[in-house]
């Protein structure tokens, strides 16, 4: 048998002639130790190159995974050579787990990489078949996860399919979402309500202060205007007369209107006596409101002489303001429960109003005293409400307190009857209303 027969060649020569093995990473080169021992040496017939009859090894095409080198030694035992061969050293990444994947396994972000593809050319290794289960990141109770299985061969790469978006059909998720939105809205609404309440609480003392000083200002302001301007100024300027009378008449109109609405808001009494008192007081309050509004224009149009320049700014406010102030602050006007609820200073104000009526029939030199008395009595009333200077009256309806209430109502009726008559007289003097009404009405034929 010739020496160049394949059976007589060395182990290294046979390894050099055999085609290289491939694994998951493609073609691999022999280690330098094996390559060094496989070089032919002169004079050694066993290390000669193969004969011409032996076909050379075919070169395989480089795979995209070339670069991952695995040094593999001869798996068969070498009885002729005593040199040790190195173990298998793999630089490739570990293979991807197969069917034993974890439940929440996410697919490979780059399907074309060497880590995701598993191409095998060796027939000794079976093709790796992987089954991926795709689950949503946020699973819901009602919506089940869809499981997708794909068979991966050594030729076809894995195609990545993203998971479908989950819906909010879960009642717990939707309920929590709505509860969050409602809580945020309620927090904003609570903030808005708190801000409104705090603003109302801050503005309420200011309005209360304005309403408390309104009767005092309504009496003193026209008196100050009378002291500042002379008789000629009031006679020449109707606007100045209007400004002087606007504040006291407006205060009385507003107070009587509020009393009328509060009185009408209560239930109507059933007995005949209470029903009569109920409608009588309602009619009086409504008449006082209308007369206070309509009296501003006629008294402003009238020409003020020397006596009128003291009467309108000083006497009229002391007539109109105290009754309205007493009825709105000192009396509890409720059907079946009408009583005096304030201090004894209310009686003093009623007495001062009667004194003012008596002073009207005297000379105009006493006019300033009526304004001074009314202003002082109202000021004492305001101080008693704020600092409790006088002892409050009991809630029971005594005969004396009922008499004071009746006296106040009679005084108001007399004052506003006088104001109504004066307003009609002034309008008739300017526009001759009575003459026009007589001409319109049919006259009786003369016999």
UniProtKB/Swiss-Prot annotation:
Residues 1-103, 147-173 are annotated as: Disordered. Transmembrane segments: none annotated. Belongs to the UPF0328 family. This is UPF0328 protein ECU10_1870. It comes from Encephalitozoon cuniculi (strain GB-M1). Residues 1-10, 64-84 have a biased composition (Basic and acidic residues). Residues 92-103 have a biased composition (Pro residues). InterPro entries: UPF0328.
């Amino acid at each position: 048998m010739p020496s160049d027969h394949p059976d007589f060649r060395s182990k290294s020569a046979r390894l050099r002639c055999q085609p290289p093995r491939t694994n998951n990473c493609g073609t691999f080169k022999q280690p330098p130790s094996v390559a060094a021992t496989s070089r032919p040496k002169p004079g050694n017939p066993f290390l000669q190159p193969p004969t011409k009859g032996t076909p050379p090894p075919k070169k395989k095409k480089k795979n995209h995974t070339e670069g991952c080198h695995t040094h593999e030694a001869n798996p068969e035992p070498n009885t002729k050579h005593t040199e040790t061969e190195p173990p298998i050293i793999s630089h490739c990444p570990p293979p991807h787990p197969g069917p034993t994947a974890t439940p929440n396994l996410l697919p490979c972000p780059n399907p074309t990489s060497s880590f995701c593809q598993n191409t095998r050319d060796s027939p000794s290794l079976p093709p790796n078949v992987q089954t991926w289960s795709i689950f949503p990141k946020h699973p819901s109770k009602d919506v089940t996860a869809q499981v997708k299985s794909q068979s991966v061969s050594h030729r076809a790469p894995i195609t990545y399919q993203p998971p479908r978006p989950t819906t909010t059909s879960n009642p717990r998720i939707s309920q929590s979402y709505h509860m969050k939105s409602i809580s945020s809205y309620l927090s904003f609404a609570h903030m808005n309500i708190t801000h409104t309440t705090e603003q109302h609480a801050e503005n309420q003392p200011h309005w209360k202060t304005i309403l408390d000083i309104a009767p005092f200002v309504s009496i003193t302001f026209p008196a100050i205007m009378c002291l500042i301007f002379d008789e000629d100024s009031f006679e020449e300027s109707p606007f100045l007369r209007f400004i002087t009378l606007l504040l006291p008449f407006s205060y009385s109109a507003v107070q009587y209107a509020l009393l009328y609405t509060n009185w009408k808001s209560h239930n109507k009494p059933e007995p005949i006596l209470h029903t009569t008192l109920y409608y009588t007081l309602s009619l009086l309050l409504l008449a006082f409101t209308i007369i206070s509004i309509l009296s501003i224009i006629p008294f402003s149009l009238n020409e003020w002489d020397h006596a009128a320049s003291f009467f309108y700014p000083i006497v009229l406010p002391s007539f109109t303001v105290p009754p309205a102030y007493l009825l709105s602050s000192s009396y509890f006007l409720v059907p079946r429960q009408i009583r005096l609820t304030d201090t004894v200073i209310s009686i003093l104000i009623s007495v001062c109003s009667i004194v003012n009526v008596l002073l009207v029939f005297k000379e105009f030199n006493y006019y300033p005293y009526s304004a001074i008395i009314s202003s002082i009595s109202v000021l004492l009333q305001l101080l008693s409400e704020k600092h409790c200077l006088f002892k409050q009256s009991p809630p029971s309806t005594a005969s004396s307190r009922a008499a004071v209430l009746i006296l106040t109502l009679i005084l108001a009726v007399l004052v506003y009857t006088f104001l109504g008559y004066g307003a009609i007289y002034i309008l008739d003097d300017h526009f001759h209303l009575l003459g026009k009404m007589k001409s319109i009405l049919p006259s009786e034929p003369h016999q």
